[in-house]
A protein has these predicted regions:
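Serine residues within intrinsically disordered or low-complexity segments
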Residues: 2-3
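Flavin-dependent oxidoreductase catalytic cores
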Residues: 7-209
Length: 209
């Protein structure tokens, strides 16, 4: 045991300097609207995110989806999170998100809810890793300069914990950062998170710091 605090290097996402141990407000549907984000910034959040936004809603110009793109200068740094199950709508949604001026565009490959994952979006994408990787590659190519990040899980279930493979393949197509929920889709939000597996991903020499 040491009384000295652990020293962490300052965190960066692409060229975005976030300092030592930044506090992130996760994107949450029906929670992280502009008022809530503003309040969390006031109380110390370093990075905030919009609610996740449907790519189908954006390309159809659905008012509810377009409303979620609205961000303010006071929120920065701020990320916009998108989700969907088809490559072309996701690439177009990423372009629309970039036009709103966020600091980060995040792809949701982690939502376990049946109405999302059951259609192949969110964590449902973990059942088709080649599609997940190709979608991510196309999104990275679709935007001009905004860093693209991904949120995902350990795998679909205990027999398919493939996050180590996924992390390397997503890194290879150009993501700037990866957030891992330490459970499988089958667990949803139940049971223990597997911090050991997250640590293996982080400490893999093939994975950039």
């Amino acid at each position: 045991y040491s009384s000295h605090p652990i020293q962490y290097p300052p965190m960066k996402i692409a060229d975005l300097e976030l300092g030592d141990k930044p506090l992130f407000l996760a994107p949450m549907e029906d929670v992280t609207d502009p008022s809530f984000r503003s309040m969390c910034k006031e109380f110390g959040a370093d990075v905030v995110y919009t609610e996740f936004i449907s790519s189908d809603g954006l390309i159809r110009d659905a008012a509810k989806s377009l409303k979620k793109l609205e961000i303010t200068e006071a929120e920065r740094p701020v990320g916009i999170q998108i989700y969907g199950h088809l490559i072309e709508p996701m690439a177009e949604a990423a372009r629309m998100a970039e036009a709103a001026g966020p600091d980060i565009i995040d792809i949701n490959f982690g939502c376990p809810m049946k109405k999302i994952a059951g259609r192949g979006a969110g964590s449902g994408m973990m059942r088709d890793v080649p599609l997940m990787v190709e979608m991510t590659r196309r999104i990275v190519q679709a935007v001009d300069h905004t860093p693209v990040t991904v949120k995902t899980r350990l795998g679909w279930d205990d027999e398919n914990k493939n996050i180590e493979e996924i992390a390397l393949r997503l890194q290879d197509v150009g993501i700037a950062a990866l957030t891992i929920h330490g459970r499988t889709r089958a667990q949803i939000y139940r049971g223990e998170a597997d911090w050991t597996l997250i640590g293996r991903v982080k400490n893999n020499p093939a994975t950039d710091e």
